[in-house]
Amino acid sequence: MLEAVGIIRETSSLPAVCGRVCPQEKQCESQCIYTLSLKKEAVSIGNLERYVADYERIHRDHSIKSKHSEKPKLGRIAVVGSGPAGLSFATDMAKWGYDVTVYEAESQLGGVLRYGIPEFCLPNSIIEDELDKMRDLGVTFQTDTIVGKTITYEGLKAQGMDGIFIATGVGVANYMGIPGEDLKGVYTASEYLAKY
């Protein structure tokens, strides 16, 4: 089973997340050869990914550090935003041998994973476990840091960053310009998901 974990992690940076919340039935399974050519039920890749990731989470030896952290670093990379794009990019860069720091404006990491997906769909413990795996790769995190205000892009370059990946994720909501949209108790979808 641990071999399956290694195979999945070659191409999926967040398998415990993707196995729970990605629409595999549209993205992967609808294009499965079993469905398209053989007219059979698709391989349930999302369920397999989740099962293998959960097995890893339960049976993982946290005392063993990744071999990747022993490699000499190729350079320093700043990642702005800790949502799925930022975390996936940071994981890949760390695997390839870069020293990666993720900067997050919020007090907790995860971006839309934490603030936009209800916890009954994606428990915070799953997010934390994926973050721990990233820490094992040598990725560091700075929360409560607004790049452009708390620290400037020039400041990042002055700290020796060789590259900056901007993964700021969910933007400002579009309002419809109708009466009452600014009243107390009226929320955008993002505000509602973050609040409740």
Positions of PLM-derived features:
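N-terminal Rossmann-like FAD-binding beta1-loop-alpha1 element of flavoenzymes
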Residues: 76-101
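Short cysteine clusters
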Residues: 18, 22, 28, 32
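N-terminal Rossmann-like dinucleotide/flavin-binding domain of flavoprotein oxidoreductases
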Residues: 5-15, 48, 113-161
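Glycine-rich FAD pyrophosphate-binding loop
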Residues: 98-114
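Ferredoxin-type iron-sulfur electron-transfer modules in oxidoreductases and energy-metabolism complexes
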Residues: 1-20, 38-71, 196
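Residue-level detector of alpha-helix initiation sites
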Residues: 13, 83-84, 108
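Glycine-rich dinucleotide-binding loop and its adjacent helix/turn
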Residues: 52-70, 129-149, 173-196
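Short hydrophobic core segments
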Residues: 80, 160-169
